[in-house]
Amino acid sequence: MGRFNPPYLGAAYYPEVWPPEQVDEDVRLMVGAGLNVARLAEFAWSSLEPSEGRLELGWLRRVVDKLGEARIATIMCTPSCTPPAWLTEKYTEALVVDHRGIRAQHGSRRHVCPLNPVYRGLCGRITLELAETFGRDERVIGWQIDNEVRLWEGWGCYCAHCMRAFREGLRQQFRSIDKLNEAWGTNVWSQTYQSFDQIPAPRPAVCHHPSLLAAWMRFQNGSLVDYVRRQADILHRHVTQPVGTDMMPILEISYEQMHRSLDVVQYNHYDGVDNLWRQVFWMDYVRPVMKTPFWNTETSTCWNGGTSANGYREPGFCRANSWLPIALGGEANLYWLWRAHWSGQELMHGCVVSTCGRPMHIADEVREVSAGFSAAGDFINGTRPAAPGFAVHLSSLAWTHFKFQPVLPEFDYVNAMQENVYRPMMEAHLRADIVDPAAPLDGYRVVFSPLLPALDEGGLQDRLQKWIEGGGTWIAGPLTDIRTIEGTKPVCAPFKYLEDWAGVSCRYELPGAPRAFGVEWPDGRVWHGSVWYAGLEPGTAEARAVYEDGPLKGLAAVTETRVGAGRIVVLGTLPQPEELKRLLLGIAAEEGIYPAAEASPNVLVVPRKGPAGNGFIVVETQNEKGRLTLPAPAYNLLDCRAYSGQVEIQPYQVMVLRQ
């Protein structure tokens, strides 16, 4: 083992904000808090390069030295998120242009165009300097590129560089303007183009063609992916440590595409008491992106906030929140931030120690987490979450399509996936990987693709068909296979592939509001659907459930078809939560997949397997008492006690149980 080993517990540290002599005190306090890693330099460009070409890295070397002497590792960041004033003054064209045509001012963050060549060149230079200085330093365990890259104001940059690149990308994709017009169907509203130069950058105030909007979002995503890749290429030539970029729980940027050039997933979140469970969803999504354990690079100790503090967290929240990434396959949890700022835009954000250096009220929880990471470290490092055999598709392209074509009033794709699909599975302890459509299907016995408009995404349709024929069970729908990648409808049927694959025909469809329609199983039990209703006529398929009222009465709501060695289950509507639990548990059991535990819905139980043995990490997520029934006696590495049978779980309790 090396000098610095996971699991890592740390915080973002900004020594450039404070007098140099304060570093010793901060390091002493970090040791007392039990931290073993700090993130440095993500907003420090003006301190690293006070004027163009004049590099001053000595202060950063001294901080890394002092941290290392205290056995605290460093995650080194490239500071490109916050360009210095000399840059934005001299190279004004590097500043982002918003959808109103207004160029950003100095003083924000991520307010620069990711395609601007001058900005990219200057980012490359500071990245190279850092890489050559720290790229083989054993005290640096990894690299973070930039900070929370995302689209400016949700729409991206509208500068001349971006406009040229957008149109050139369309020209390369379609080769001729006639092919673009044909693919998008631009005859609607007389939108036909005679040249690529006529294609506008869509602005939010205009009711634009959905295909144009989807193309613009794909372009903006690709611009940011390429921006990060260019820094990653520099780092990979000079550093030995893993390289990542910290991302938020959003789908406007494709995690799958972003990480093609990276080594580790770095993930930030700030969910609180009411929605901590949603982080289980997101971590089940970031875990399969790469085989290496992910890093939770930012979360709050007690509350987040900029100029206001956004919500008190109850005692125990910091403990449960800190353990979630470790339980779910990560190897690091870092807080934002170490010491609260004394000036600037985020004065009210939670921290580990206050502005004046006094430990916050959660200090004991931080120390408890540190002690737990140490006590269970061998088990954590020697195991991984057990492969679930079950996958659920989540798509950035689906997010884009539903953003501009919500299908239903106020429909929110991510919320529907979390509340209507994932939460019932989580409460039933049916563990799953949440995967991008481009992800391999090997190792999964059941794949659920709800609300997945375009099966062409990531070449899914070919791989999926072969996987089904080879023995996989695919659960499709509702609102799956209803669009092309360009956001248009199939013209020969409501679905592009599904009718042929599944042996069904969709007679007609109804929206899922304002009323719910009943569905009946063969045993006479009635339940209600949600979101959408497709009335299916079985051909070679078998009707498993039929609508029992309304215009769809007598048509199938759920069908099943054998395809090769596998099968397709089509959902014409999304069962409400309790019925979805029953349906998915039944299908999973038929494929040899069973709940991870017998436990109350508020208790997360993650099976772990590996050279260090078998066991579970248990986290209570709702600040309520719960219960867990153990299948065999187990030893809790956190309190050094043996448990068997039914165990009462306390609010926000964590257990690391080795069998």
Where are these regions (language model features)?
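Short, well-ordered coil/turn segments that N-cap beta-strands
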Residues: N5-L9, G34-N36, G68-T74, R136-I141, ...
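Aromatic-lined substrate-binding rim segments of carbohydrate-active enzymes
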Residues: D24-G32, R39-I102, R230-H238, A454
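Short, acidic/polar
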Residues: V17-G32, C123-E129, M247-M258, Q279, ...
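Carbohydrate-binding surfaces of carbohydrate-active enzymes
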Residues: F196-I199, R237, Y270-Q659
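An acidic-aromatic substrate-binding cleft motif
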Residues: M1-Q22, V27-V37, F390
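The substrate-binding groove and active-site-proximal loops of carbohydrate-active enzymes
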Residues: Y8-P20, A41-G58, Q105-G124, V149-E153, ...
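Polysaccharide-binding and catalytic clefts of secreted carbohydrate-active enzymes
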Residues: R100-V264, L276-W282
